[in-house]
Amino acid sequence: MGKKILVQRAGRGGSQFRSPSWRRIAPLRYVQFSEEQLKTTIRGIIKELVHVTGLNAPAMHVVLENGEEMYLPAVEGVYVGKIIEFGPDAKVEPGNVMPIGKIPEGTMVCNIEKRVGDGGKYARSSGTYGVVMIHRDSTTLVQLPSGRMIEVDSRARATIGIVAGGGRIEKPFVKAGNKYHRARTKAWKYPKVRGKAMSAYAHPHGGGSHQQGGTPVKKNAPPGQKVGFYGSKCTGRGCVRWRAQQAKTQQRQQA
């Protein structure tokens, strides 16, 4: 009896295929401020720069003057002990958090909120940033790292600067063990085995005395879906002789 292939098992979403988010220190997001706090400048200090399992960029642990704590994606140029400002009147410096409507046009920002108060959704991966393009009445046009333009509420918060850890993908893994540990933090399955290298019960392309290329079209597909040789007993010049012999045999039997 056959088995479900790996892709089908992953599609079900069992525990083996879920990203182990419980290993992370905390979610990287802005804390919720009251309406009064949003109008003033709140200061905080970076206590430490930490690595969060499963994330591409380092994180900074920020403690506010009112005692609240949060973890945010670290930006280039910050350091332990740096004072971080939150508010519309904050200085335009790396690490400070401001409403995107108060940030000058052309400024590079990261951890941009999609909706006001959601904690940050855009430009959070290592080395990424968005660019403030145009301010309008109540919205701001932002260019994302992909080049796509989006319009967000001018009250949405963003961090000044570029997310730290740029150039991460330029460093080679070198060893398969490094790639294994990388995949384990994301619940990826590594190494990835080819279907035709498996046994027949494990994959439709598996089995046989030697590896053969599979086909994406099943044998019982309708005629319009099959083009070329699908399920043919033989092909080539030898097949012509074989069919001629079969035709002669049928004629003798009919005679």
UniProtKB/Swiss-Prot annotation:
GO cellular component: cytosolic large ribosomal subunit
Region described as Disordered: spans on this chain: 201-229
GO MF term list: rRNA binding; structural constituent of ribosome
Pfam families: Ribosomal_L2, Ribosomal_L2_C
Record keywords, A-Z: Ribonucleoprotein, Ribosomal protein, RNA-binding, rRNA-binding
InterPro entries: NA-bd_OB-fold, Rib_uL2_dom2, Ribosomal_uL2, Ribosomal_uL2_arc_euk, Ribosomal_uL2_C, Ribosomal_uL2_dom3, Ribosomal_uL2_RNA-bd_dom, Translation_prot_SH3-like_sf
SUPFAM superfamilies linked to this entry: Nucleic acid-binding proteins, Translation proteins SH3-like domain
One GO term of the biological process aspect: cytoplasmic translation
Family recorded in the similarity comment: Belongs to the universal ribosomal protein uL2 family.
Annotated function: One of the primary rRNA binding proteins. Required for association of the 30S and 50S subunits to form the 70S ribosome, for tRNA binding and peptide bond formation. It has been suggested to have peptidyltransferase activity; this is somewhat controversial. Makes several contacts with the 16S rRNA in the 70S ribosome.
Description of how the protein assembles with itself and partners: Part of the 50S ribosomal subunit. Forms a bridge to the 30S subunit in the 70S ribosome.
Protein name, UniProt field: Large ribosomal subunit protein uL2
Species of the source: Caldivirga maquilingensis (strain ATCC 700844 / DSM 13496 / JCM 10307 / IC-167)
Designated gene of the protein: rpl2
